[in-house]
């Protein structure tokens, strides 16, 4: 597993002050206020856009390089179903929760390398839409604790999705420095 994939998967869920529901298909909250503010703004920006329009916005508004955006989209497009990840209950019941934790991961000290690591990790998660992935990447990348060792946790709840299908839905996400 690449260091980039491991980094993004190392976000750990912690207590959250608020929750944000969005049309991008994901409801998350961060313990870090800066990340939460960036997520709220990015989710508004990406709502209703095509994947191509989101890619353009990531480059022109959020300062990602074209190669970072290409990497994000290719990893997102090739991601596995959440049910293929080890650790998730094999026979869950409705309402059951699972905290997927990866880490500890030491972030690179330079911003670009850390951003690429987060892109790989978050894009590989079973997040319901490219817009939601892009919003998460944008929110986290702007507030990375460079050079720190972190644990990332994503809490999932099993139940009916917005499409009326039973599945795991990502919820609270947090980055904890260890």
What residue ranges belong to the model's regions?
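Transmembrane alpha-helical hairpins and terminal membrane-anchor modules
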Residues: 138-145
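Transmembrane helix interruption/hinge and helix-loop junction motifs
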Residues: 127-132
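N-terminal propeptides/leader regions of secreted preproproteins
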Residues: 12-107
């Amino acid at each position: 597993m690449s260091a980039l994939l491991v980094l993004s998967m190392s976000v750990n869920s912690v207590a959250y002050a608020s929750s944000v529901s969005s049309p991008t298909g994901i409801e998350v909250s961060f313990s870090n206020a800066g990340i939460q503010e960036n997520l709220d703004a990015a989710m508004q920006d990406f709502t209703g856009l095509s994947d191509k329009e989101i890619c353009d916005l990531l480059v022109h508004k959020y300062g990602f390089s074209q190669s970072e955006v290409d990497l994000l989209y290719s990893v997102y497009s090739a991601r596995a179903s959440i049910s293929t990840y080890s650790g998730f209950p094999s026979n869950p019941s409705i309402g059951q929760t699972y905290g997927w934790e990866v880490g500890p991961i030491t972030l690179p000290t330079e911003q670009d390398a850390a951003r690429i690591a987060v892109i790989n990790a978050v894009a590989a998660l079973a997040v319901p839409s490219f817009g939601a992935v892009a919003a998460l990447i944008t929110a986290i990348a702007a507030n990375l604790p460079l050079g720190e060792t972190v644990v990332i946790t994503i809490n999932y709840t099993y139940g009916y999705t917005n499409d009326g299908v039973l599945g795991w839905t990502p919820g609270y996400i947090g980055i904890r420095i260890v």
